[in-house]
Amino acid sequence: MYNASEKRYENMLYNRCGKSGLKLPAVSLGLWHNFGDTAPFETMRQICFTAFDNGITHFDLANNYGPEPGSAEKNFGRILKEDLGQYRDELIISTKAGYDMWPGPYGNWGSRKYLLASLDQSLQRMGLEYVDIFYHHRMDPETPLEETMGALAQAVSSGKALYAGLSNYDGETLKKASAILDELRCPFIINQNRYSIFDRTIENNGLKDTAAELGKGIIAFSPLAQGLLTNRYLNGIPEDSRIMTDGRFLTKDALTEERLQQIRNLNGIAAGRGQTLAEMALSWVLRDGIVTSVLVGASRPEQVLDDIRAIQNLEFSKEELAKIDSVSL
């Protein structure tokens, strides 16, 4: 039987999620990779234990995380049932719906039909009565925003979610969605978007500024650019790397000679700060207080500990930020 460390809250930093009452750990655990049916179950357990023992209270999922879709929720549900469930009131569990999940016109995008059915399925897979945060996973070009936001509000009012979130939205759509959710008196508190030194889309599409203006939190996924912003690729592509073993999200084409040189230059800046490249990359995302938390993935427990070290040095000089920009933009 798992017993959590009594010192689990001693070293983690917790940030308020926008203007809400909810605080999230500066580092959260994402189950996008490594929690599907192809991963060893015992490794998943140890990753979750290491995370929680070190103050990571937030576990982020989606209906389609796997492989196969749904398997990450199912595996996490088993960990909850066997081990972590006794700590449910100390956990922030999120899930999402928005990508293709089942055949036909009702298993994708942003209709009320799809979102509420998907949430019920997610709760069943995880063995939960509610999730803490329920996200719409991506903007839907066809469904009226009022319908999608209405579904999020219904999820909360029904008691199946405590808060609503939006993922992969831009600033303009965020502003419209937020106004609708305000009218519905729905506690919308957080945006989840890709953000890293190599991907600054949210700085350019208005999402980051709008979230700050509206008092909404941001949680950043892929802050290590799928592992590129680590020491993994400093000397080329290892045989056991994600590029070689799982080409779904990161391909050889992503590691050009120019990109490799950028990684090496950034590694030099990190060394000057007394950090690893991964630590600096995570610190950079958290640098100005607008991003509430960074989502990290892990294929083994030690990686979780490595990532948590980023919070020990979140300060950057103007010179360091300028150097990072000069070698990465």
Predicted feature descriptions by range:
Residues 123-143:
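Active-site groove signature of glycoside hydrolases
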Residues 1-91:
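N-terminal binding-site loop/beta-alpha segment at the start of enzyme catalytic domains
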Residues 38-51, 110-126, 174-178:
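Short, acidic/polar
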Residues 35-40, 64-72, 140-144, 171-172, ...:
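Acidic-and-aromatic substrate-binding clefts and catalytic sites of carbohydrate-active enzymes
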Residues 18-36, 94-107, 130, 135:
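N-terminal small/glycine-rich loop or linker at the start of catalytic domains
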Residues 39-43, 71, 75, 106-114, ...:
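Alpha-helix N-cap and loop-to-helix initiation/capping positions
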Residues 2-6, 143-329:
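Beta/alpha (TIM)-barrel catalytic core signal, keyed to glycine-rich beta->alpha loops juxtaposed to Asp/Glu
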